[in-house]
């Protein structure tokens, strides 16, 4: 507990919150261009080939973003929309690509949680 004299000498310092997605620069999403589309393996104890893309954002950052859903149509030079959100078992992947926006097509034959994968409502 500081004394009044100590507070006069120097004010209390604000605790600055560190952002979990700095490349978005306080925007909800950012547009970017895929520079590389590849698969990577998760850390223990999981095992899979996770689809990720290296994306150069309009903010100037180059980030690794996860491609959610089964199957995708992304390749180099695809223009994608990137949102925040990490993938727990992929170290260094702190962003997600938004399916159904720009060049990233929605997931085919998706019936549940469609809005998360950019899938249209199926015909009855």
Swiss-Prot record:
Subcellular location: Plastid, Cyanelle
A GO BP annotation: translation
Main localization, broad class: plastid
One term of GO molecular function: rRNA binding
Gene3D superfamilies: Nucleic acid-binding proteins (2.40.50.140)
Region named Disordered: 105-124
Keywords recorded for this protein, A-Z: Cyanelle, Plastid, Ribonucleoprotein, Ribosomal protein, RNA-binding, rRNA-binding
Compositional bias ranges of the Basic residues kind: 113-124
Signal peptide region: none
NCBIfam families named among the record's database cross-references: rpsL_bact
Similarity annotation: Belongs to the universal ribosomal protein uS12 family.
Stated role: With S4 and S5 plays an important role in translational accuracy. Located at the interface of the 30S and 50S subunits.
HAMAP family per UniProt: Ribosomal_uS12_B
Subunit structure: Part of the 30S ribosomal subunit.
The name this protein goes by in its record: Small ribosomal subunit protein uS12c
Lineage, uppermost ranks: Eukaryota, Glaucocystophyceae, Cyanophoraceae, Cyanophora
Gene name, Swiss-Prot/TrEMBL: rps12
């Amino acid at each position: 507990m500081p004394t009044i004299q100590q507070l006069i000498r120097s004010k209390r310092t604000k605790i600055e919150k560190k952002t979990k997605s700095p490349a978005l620069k306080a925007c909800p999403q950012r547009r970017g261009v895929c520079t590389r589309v590849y698969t990577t393996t998760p850390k223990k104890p999981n095992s899979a080939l996770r689809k990720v893309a290296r994306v150069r954002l309009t903010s100037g950052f180059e980030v690794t973003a996860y491609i959610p859903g089964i199957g995708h149509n992304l390749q180099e030079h695809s223009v994608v929309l990137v949102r925040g959100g990490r993938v727990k078992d992929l170290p260094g992947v702190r962003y997600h690509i938004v399916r159904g926006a720009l060049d990233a097509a929605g997931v085919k034959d998706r019936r549940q949680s469609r809005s998360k994968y950019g899938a249209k409502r199926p015909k009855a």
